[in-house]
Amino acid sequence: MNQFMLLGFIAFGGAFGACARYLISELCVVLLGKGFPYGTLTVNIVGSLIMGVLMSSLNQGIIEAAPCRPIIGLGFLGALTTFSTFSMDNVILMQQGEVIKAGLNILLNVTLSITACFIGFQLMKS
């Protein structure tokens, strides 16, 4: 696969990931309100679960690396999940004096995202 085609695959996946992130974030606001960054937490957990499934599937040869890895791993998941928004959410919470909420958000994002990735990986091993 040439580099131009690879970039096209990544952009294709990224377009869907960005749209999914927006829709999930908006849905979280409607369902859960604006008092906590539920949207960022949700996309990071879901993205980590998908990454675990993807990597386990690639390792086992269930799916072929090209073009799945660049489309899903780099494009879709790169646009869906975000560390910069996670960081900004916590800075805003701390600036608002919501130190406990910021700590809870950090704990939940890190713990649940890693757990979801592990679960996704294990699901594909069985």
Swiss-Prot record:
Q: Which reaction equation describes what this protein catalyses?
A: fluoride(in) = fluoride(out)
Keywords from the named record: Cell inner membrane, Cell membrane, Ion channel, Ion transport, Membrane, Metal-binding, Sodium, Transmembrane, Transmembrane helix, Transport
Predominant place of localization: membrane
Q: How does it sit in the membrane?
A: Multi-pass membrane protein
Q: Which domain of life is it from?
A: Bacteria
Residue positions annotated to bind Na(+) are G78, T81
UniProt note on regulation of activity: Na(+) is not transported, but it plays an essential structural role and its presence is essential for fluoride channel function.
Q: Does the keyword Transmembrane apply?
A: yes
Tell me a Gene Ontology molecular-function term this record carries.
metal ion binding
Q: Which GO terms describe its biological process?
A: cellular detoxification of fluoride
The record lists the membrane-crossing segments as 4-24, 35-55, 71-91, 104-124
UniProt-annotated location(s): Cell inner membrane
What is one GO cellular-component annotation here?
plasma membrane
Task: Indicate the family of this protein.
Answer: Belongs to the fluoride channel Fluc/FEX (TC 1.A.43) family.
Q: What does this protein do?
A: Fluoride-specific ion channel. Important for reducing fluoride concentration in the cell, thus reducing its toxicity.
What NCBIfam families does UniProt report for this protein, alphabetically?
Answer: crcB (TIGR00494), PRK14200.1 (NF010796)
Q: PANTHER family given for it?
A: FLUORIDE EXPORT PROTEIN 1-RELATED
Listed name of the protein? Fluoride-specific ion channel FluC
Source organism of this protein record: Aliivibrio salmonicida (strain LFI1238)
